[in-house]
Structure formats: C-alpha cells, structure tokens
C-alpha cells in the first residue's frame, strides 16, 4: 500500500508540476505586459538588476539542501528515526546561521550600492534600490532556515503539497501587485508583495511538516563525522550552486553596471523565456530525485544500479526532449512576433537574447536527471570542475561582448560557455564517472529528432509567409504548428 501511495504521489506531483508551469506561463502572458506598461523599461530593469544582485547571496546555501535528501534517504532505509531528528536539528541550526550572514551581507550592500553600480543607476534609482535590497535581504535571511522544512517535505515525496502551495502564490501575487503598481509603488511595491507571499509559503510548509509529517528535531549528540560528511558532500555542490548563480545573475549585474537599466530590461525579457523553458525540464526531473537516491542506496550490484539509472536518465530525457523541442522550435518560429505584441516597442532584441540562451541550454536541460545521479553517487565534483570553466569563460566573454552588443552580447557569451560545458565536458563525465550509457542516450535522442523534420519545414514557411499581426492570427498559427508537431 505504501508503494502504491508513493507511486500515486509521484504521478500527482508530476501532474501538478506541469500545472505550476502552466500557471507561471499563463500569469506571465497576462500580467507581464500590464506590468511593463505601468513600470516602464527603466523601472523594470531596476527591479531585475536588484533581484539579480541579491540572488547571488543565495550561494551561501552551500548545497546543503541536496545533502539533506542524501542523508535522509540513508537514515530512512535503516529506519533510524533519532538520526533523522538530529539531522533536522543540525540543518536548522546551520541554515539559521547562514540566514543571519546573508541578511547582514544584503544590509551592507543596500547601504553601499555604489560599490556595485557606480555609474549604471541614477540617484533616484539608488534610493529605490536600497529599499528593495533590504526587503530582499530579509526575505533571503528568513528563507534559509525555512528551507529545512522544504527539504523535509521533498524527502517524504509529498510533492503535491509543495506544488499546490506554490500554485496559490503564483496565481494570487499579480492580484496584489497590480493595485500597488497602479497606486504608484512601482518596483518597491512588487518587492514587498514577493516578500509577503514567500513568508506565507514558508509558514505553510512549517505547519505542514509539523502537523502532517511529524517533523521533530534534536540538537546536539550528532553522529560522529556527520558535519564533516555533510560539508564534504555539500562543498562540491556549493561550487555548482555558486557557478549556476553567477551564470544566471552575472549578465544582469554587468549590464546594469556598463549599459544601464534599459538594457537590463531587454535582457530580462529574453531571459524570462529561457527561465520558463528551464521549468519545463526541471518540473519532471524533480519528482525522480528521491527515487534516484533510493536506487543508489539500495541496489548494491553496480551493473544493475547503472542499468536502472541509465533507464531513468533516458526516460526522463526523452520526455524532456519531447516537450522542449516543441517549445524551442515554436519560439524560433513565433517568438519574434509574440514579443512584438506582448512586450511592445523597445524589446525587439529580447528575441535574440532568448535564442542565445535557450538553444545552447537544451543539452543540459534534457539531461537534468544526470545532475542528481552524480550527487547520489557522490561524484558531483566533476560537474563542479566543468562549471568553473563555464563561469570563467562566461565572465570574460560577457565583459567584452556586453559593452559591444549590449544584452545580445551578454546572452551570446552565456550561450557559448554553456555549449562548451554541457555538450562536451559534462557528457564525458557522465560516461566516465557515473556509468551512464551516454551513447545509448544520444541514439534515443537522435531517433526522436527525426520526427522534427516535418514540423521544422512547416515552421519555416509559417515564419516566412504567414501574417501574425494580432494575437488571434498568432494563436491560430501556433495551433497549426502544434498540430503538425
């Protein structure tokens, strides 16, 4: 019965993950144009510049949330309840300390913004940025210890609750933000609403963990060597987290410094599409994380373990590729027309920003399961090495290209770095260090790609000859393309 319940929870979780994705996209489609026209390009650019800056402090998590799943799975297999309680206590303590450090760092930045944005922001923008930075720093400081409860719920595979509570946040946030925007609170008002809803989610997760999942914790008397094991495991994940965060936020920060908030706004619109593109892949792979760790911890025969992990790698990859190929090819065909209608004048370059990010990212996104397989096998240091290379290449290229071609140059730099890391280095690591049959994986993907020939030909003629001057005609052609696909 328990196995059946877990199976149902995975199915419901996978379903709700796509409901959440759909909700995010629908809200973005309806809300973002309204927000852009109320805020204006510079104010929207300011909001994204500050969000990207403060988000860099999230690297202080040091990958501990991933370590929690690993050690929880180990203790759960042996039914070591007391060790789980002490694990909970250790994580709460560590994250509480990290939260304080993150808040203090954010507070320091808020009163010393000229250290980062000496020329990119005006005096008025700096004043608004200070308030936003304080709110976001407080949000980050509280969210760190609360993430222990999120990890606890995920470890129990209660994905339906996680996704349901986030769907509520996604759907309700615009209904609170729009009145504040109309009242003239601008980017500061948006930041305040984000803070309030995040606190609501945190509180809901705490109550659910304690009342429904019997969350308990104990401080002290930890297993000998536990913290050392956690630190060694998490330190390599931390490198990945830091590099991911740098690659995701670096472009906006550098554009804010060298090119101003208007160019950040153009970049942010393009990056938004890439963000939703990423969600399509991670939403399905997330529900397989506990199962991957269970296989690694329970299947002792290495050949059988690698066989099962390869099956998951291929299964998840094929599903992800089926969805992402439709989204990416569809954006290539319809993205330019959609951005013109949706965002309005001044955002034409956002189409190229999105393409420079989306196309190279596809390789990594259809292999998301491999990241967790590396972590479960404790060989994730190899991904860390490749990500360091990616970050350095991205940093150097972005500094030069963003000053020459603005937002498009910054996104092109990120795309080049992603191809180097994801297509070449990571696939070699998967094959050599995790035992995944990468050749079998790519054979499956190539066979699947044959089905794209007809849709691509159809898309070429639609993009070249079809009129898409309104939402109605655009929607009709999208339906035609999706039907052919």
Residue ranges and their predicted role:
Residues 9-74, 102-107, 139, 169-174, ...:
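Signature of the first transmembrane helix
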Residues 131-135, 232, 390, 404, ...:
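Transmembrane alpha-helical segments of multi-pass transport proteins
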Residues 7, 11, 140-166, 183-188, ...:
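Membrane-interface junctions at transmembrane-helix termini in multi-pass inner-membrane proteins
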Residues 110-135, 331-362, 434:
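Interfacial segments at transmembrane-helix termini and the short loops linking adjacent helices
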Residues 1-10, 127, 187, 203-248, ...:
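Interhelical loop/hinge segments that connect adjacent transmembrane helices in multipass membrane
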Residues 62-78, 92, 155, 213-214, ...:
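Helix-loop junctions and terminal segments of transmembrane helices
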Residues 34-43, 160, 171-203, 381, ...:
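Membrane-interface helix-loop junctions in multi-pass transport and translocation proteins
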Residues 12-28, 193-205, 209, 224-294, ...:
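Transmembrane helical elements of multi-pass membrane transporters/channels
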């Amino acid at each position: 019965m328990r196995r059946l319940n877990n199976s149902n929870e995975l199915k419901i979780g996978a379903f709700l993950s796509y409901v959440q994705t759909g909700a995010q996209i629908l809200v973005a489609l309806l809300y973002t144009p309204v927000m852009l026209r109320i805020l204006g390009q510079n104010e929207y650019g300011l909001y994204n510049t500050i969000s990207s800056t403060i988000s860099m402090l999230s690297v202080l998590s040091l990958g501990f949330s991933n370590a929690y799943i690993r050690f929880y799975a180990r203790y759960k297999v042996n039914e070591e309840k007391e060790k789980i309680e002490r694990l909970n206590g250790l994580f709460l303590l560590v994250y509480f300390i990290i939260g304080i450090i993150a808040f203090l760092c954010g507070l320091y930045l808020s009163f010393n913004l000229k250290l980062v944005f000496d020329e990119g922001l005006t005096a008025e923008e700096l004043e608004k940025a200070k308030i936003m930075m304080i709110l976001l720093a407080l949000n980050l400081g509280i969210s760190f210890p609360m993430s222990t409860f999120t990890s606890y719920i995920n470890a129990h595979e209660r994905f339906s609750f996680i996704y349901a509570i986030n769907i509520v946040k996604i759907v309700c946030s615009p209904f609170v933000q729009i009145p504040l925007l109309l009242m003239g609170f601008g980017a500061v008002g948006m930041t305040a609403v984000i803070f309030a809803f995040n606190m609501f989610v945190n509180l809901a997760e705490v109550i659910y963990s304690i009342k429904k999942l019997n969350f308990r914790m104990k401080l002290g008397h930890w297993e000998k060597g536990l913290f050392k094991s956690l630190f060694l495991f998490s330190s390599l994940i931390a490198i990945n987290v830091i590099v991911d965060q740098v690659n995701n936020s670096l472009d906006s920060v550098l554009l804010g410094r060298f090119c101003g908030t208007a160019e950040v706004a153009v970049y942010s619109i393009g990056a938004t599409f890439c963000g939703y593109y990423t969600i399509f892949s991670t939403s399905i792979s997330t529900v397989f994380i506990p199962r991957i760790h269970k296989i690694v911890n329970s299947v002792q025969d290495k050949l059988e373990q690698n066989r099962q992990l390869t099956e998951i790698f291929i299964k998840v990859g094929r599903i992800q590729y089926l969805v992402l190929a439709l989204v990416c090819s569809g954006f290539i065909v319809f993205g330019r027309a959609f951005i013109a209608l949706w965002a309005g004048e001044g955002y034409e370059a956002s189409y190229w920003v999105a393409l420079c990010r989306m196309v190279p990212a596809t390789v990594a996104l259809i292999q998301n399961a491999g990241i967790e397989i590396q972590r479960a096998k404790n060989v994730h240091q190899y991904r860390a090495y490749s990500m360091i290379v990616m970050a350095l290449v991205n940093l150097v290229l972005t500094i030069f290209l963003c000053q020459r071609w603005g937002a498009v140059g910054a996104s092109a730099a990120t795309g080049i770095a992603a191809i180097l890391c994801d297509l070449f280095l990571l696939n070699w690591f998967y094959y050599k260090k995790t035992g995944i049959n990468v050749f079998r994986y790519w054979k499956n993907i190539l066979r699947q790609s044959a089905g794209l020939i007809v849709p691509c030909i159809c898309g070429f003629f639609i993009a070249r000859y079809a009129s898409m001057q309104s939402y109605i005609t655009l929607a009709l052609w999208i339906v035609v393309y999706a039907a052919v696909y």
